[in-house]
């Protein structure tokens, strides 16, 4: 009994110590008296594009517990497969392309229709034909049971072993078409790659939730590459000297890789990319023949889940937010707002993240509001807007203009108002809650509408008639007209 009591006392002491350490790791990190529109602080150049990184040590990003990155992939550029230590949500800001994910433990569901003969060159036939068969195979196997999927995986392994002496068909996990407006949710540890098959740059922005319960490391983004090599390294991240960032296969000895993959040592050395200085975005020479579904102009409407087919291997991870006909708030003369949460994309319930897409016309205003359950990171994709943000002390901590490519972090509870100053202002907003709640200060569903007139009149020392106008004059819920440029001065601080 005494031993059990000692063990219990020790466990409680450790928990208290760890809790205290976590709480004191970043003391007062959200006591912000000024916010800034942020630009990328580091650029990692590659053969067919670049990766632009925001400084996650910036106070407002530390408060939100996130990091932010922008991938710019040139035509025929391939972003090599990598995985992250935490949940992330990406948004396709420009262009189109292909995306592939490899979910651990899941079998291949796309199978090629053409047979590859060793020494015959490319194993791929015409893209359209193989795509239709790949889609059929994906749907058929994706709804199969676990044992059937395991059987397919074993069959693929058997085909791979036999491929040294006879023909075989390539098999891999799901490949999707992506386009502007697509929002992509990804689990930690899921390897992901992108390919630009269009004629213009493919621009993808992503937020990583460093404070996620799924991140068991520190509050630093850790990207693990399966292929390629970054000659510039991550000195900006870890404070180390300038040294390349190699892929994870580089750390193993060639002999171990040769035994694991059943290949010769020379090929194993090639997997380590030691002499490869192309970076993490490489240019594909010739056709890019992967199995893909046929491209459709519009995505089919999702059917109601039946509780059987939705597994970690087949879970939908993308949704498009650029279609006004599917908007949650739409006014032809003002603009629209589309919300993506776990009710629309169930995978977000596990990731505890959500997104909002906004597009408003000049002089349209998003009514003052705050998020009661999440931090938010706003990225401008097009145009310009005037934004004011107010903290818990009643100080205006941001009062200025944001433009395309800039980032603004808005902590939980901070109130914000946006007004478009260009012909069109468009943004994507990432939130650290699967079902973030918005509370408005003015409008039909606002906090003012919920207060009695007597409370408003006495609280602000105004007449009942003035209180009535404050409460009822704004009939909109989210978007309204702005009368024109307001007075925007320097951030206002409380009197000393």
UniProtKB/Swiss-Prot annotation:
Gly residues bias: start-end ranges: 122-154
Source gene? BnC2
Q: Which residues carry this modification: Phosphothreonine?
A: 109, 432
What the record says about family reads: Belongs to the 11S seed storage protein (globulins) family.
SUPFAM superfamilies, per database record: RmlC-like cupins
Signal sequence extent: 1-23
GO-annotated biological processes: seed maturation
Domain of life, per UniProt, equals: Eukaryota
Checking InterPro entries in the record gives: 11S_seedstore_CS, 11S_seedstore_pln, Cupin_1, RmlC-like_jellyroll, RmlC_Cupin_sf, Seed_Storage-Functional
Organism per entry: Brassica napus (Rape)
Region ranges (Disordered): 114-170
CDD domains found in the cross-reference section: cupin_11S_legumin_C (cd02243), cupin_11S_legumin_N (cd02242)
On this chain, the residues bearing Phosphotyrosine are 336
- What functional role does this protein have? This is a seed storage protein.
- In this protein, which residues make up the domain named Cupin type-1? 35-269, 319-468
Q: Which residues carry this modification: Phosphoserine?
A: 338
User: What is the annotated quaternary arrangement, including any partners?
Assistant: Hexamer; each subunit is composed of an acidic and a basic chain derived from a single precursor and linked by a disulfide bond.
* Name of the protein in its database record: Cruciferin BnC2
Is this entry keyworded Disulfide bond? yes
Q: Which Pfam families match?
A: Cupin_1 (PF00190)
S-S pairs: 30-63, 106-313
Q: Which PANTHER family match?
A: 11S GLOBULIN (PTHR31189:SF49), OS03G0336100 PROTEIN-RELATED (PTHR31189)
Q: Which GO terms describe its molecular function?
A: nutrient reservoir activity
Alphabetically list the UniProt keywords: Disulfide bond, Phosphoprotein, Seed storage protein, Signal, Storage protein
